[in-house]
């Protein structure tokens, strides 16, 4: 899939923008604070209905307006799709082909994106919540049902934690109802995550071995707070541990086990990647991003759109070459932001170059 056209109205520092793109590489050049990252954020927002930079929707609205409108014309294998998001102080409205979507799970996945931004370099050593978010964003695009089940899980988790904080004593019968619901939704969330990590590991290891010239292998480990011996009995084991932890959870006023506490670990040649070098971290993250692209195509039959936000300067020539080779081989529409073409040592033919200045975007040229 690829974005043929994007229109922004009152988004960040863009009062109004209408642009069309190449189905291959699109490079956006400009000084800092001109709107390059805002532009990629808009594509991300149109795909996932959320920003990767802020939770405050009001920050997305142009300073002298009260509403935001984003529309995009997306070419999928199945045909052209029009996406639209309207944002105001009353909330957000999402539409596919002018039809309002009642649930996010009906909208997300229509246009898949993979974002590679400087903050992704913190994925290995950052907080566990970053790694859970990484899993959730990918899975939500590949399997819309996952978003629905995760939403149900989080709703019941909030109910259970609220009860634990307010109750003077445990009502075993009431807690049993919440336990059953939490274990049911949570088990399905974990099953999806386990399948995803197993598939992602194979793709990521293939890319990592290519980047390291066969010197390194990459493995991923989904580490659950729920102890289970096989995937088919997660529900029973989860339910048992919730019941077992009633007193502990009541004392601590929160739920001590479940996918909301699960972790993802990375290993290079069998050693925890927390102890890897900076160069190895960059190779690991690059391998993951390329694996995301490959896996989304394998599981859905369509390519995602790749967003590279000021990361090419973080990669040496070898890693740049590997990334661009993958993009070209997989025929992935790619958006690259940069302050200079000097960092892009291996630009192929057929790219489209744009210049970004103070919230305006002007096409420079197509390189053939």
From Swiss-Prot:
It comes from the Bacteria. ATP binds at residues 30-37. GO terms for biological process: DNA replication; DNA synthesis involved in DNA repair; double-strand break repair; SOS response. It is found in: Cytoplasm. GO terms for molecular function: ATP binding; single-stranded DNA binding. Pfam families: SMC_N (PF02463). GO terms for cellular component: cytoplasm. InterPro entries: DNA-binding_RecF (IPR001238), DNA-binding_RecF_CS (IPR018078), P-loop_NTPase (IPR027417), RecF/RecN/SMC_N (IPR003395), RecF_2 (IPR042174). Signal peptide: none annotated. Belongs to the RecF family. The RecF protein is involved in DNA metabolism; it is required for DNA replication and normal SOS inducibility. RecF binds preferentially to single-stranded, linear DNA. It also seems to bind ATP. PANTHER family: DNA REPLICATION AND REPAIR PROTEIN RECF. This is DNA replication and repair protein RecF. It comes from Streptococcus pyogenes serotype M1. The gene is recF.
